[in-house]
């Protein structure tokens, strides 16, 4: 393996680790039986704390400004975030996967959107 390939693999692993950490900060997914609008929230406060504890900012050169505690994603953006964090990164082994699955079951357009997103992404 060349040095360039090793660096590329290391970066992929770092991104995967960060996304795995982000998946632990999902603290809310709306449910289709209650609302027609998909929404998910990530708890930034706990995410920032995880990053600080693991000293992630040292190798990524990130500065954290704790102005907002929660990131809110809605509709298509929420679907993309949840798909990456729950399905791809955690391979569907996430406590909130059943709620995510309810959205896919209830809304056929979401499933088609994810198939297209996957084709474009990979």
From Swiss-Prot:
It holds the Pfam family DUF5844. InterPro entries: DUF5844 (IPR043888). Belongs to the IIV-6 115R family. This is Uncharacterized protein 115R.
